[in-house]
Amino acid sequence: MTDIISDEPVFFTDTIIHSKLIKKKSFIWVTFQKEGIHKYPQAATDPKLATGDWLDVSFLGTPHRHIFHFRVEMEVFHDDRDVEFIQAKRIMERWYSDGALQLHWKSCEMMANDLYDKCSVQWPNRDYTIEVSEDGENGCRISFERIAGE
């Protein structure tokens, strides 16, 4: 088989970078913060957590305050404000301020899953990656990818 070389432009729906065809996905991201009180009740009694030594985290079993940091990456399908990120951020912040979403005593993973549930209704059929951390220090990152054909 011979390679065909032409000076004519070739247009693809994907992108050619460094002479290799790649599949391109674009994302926007927004960040916001919410103050919250939570606890991890099992930490007070689980022997793996309430160790009584330098690994002890039994204090997590009592209510304690954090500034929860959120970062939401959302797939977009064109580069001209498919989703306006300032509006998306305001919508997400409002979900917490009006009580549609609540922090309660939830883990970072639970908060990320709850936030995905709301995002996927507001902006459906997109891939998401959501990060939630306690004070910007420790947290989770969960990717939600659409299943082909659904």
Model-found features: residue ranges?
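Charge-rich, low-complexity N-terminal segments
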Residues: 1-150
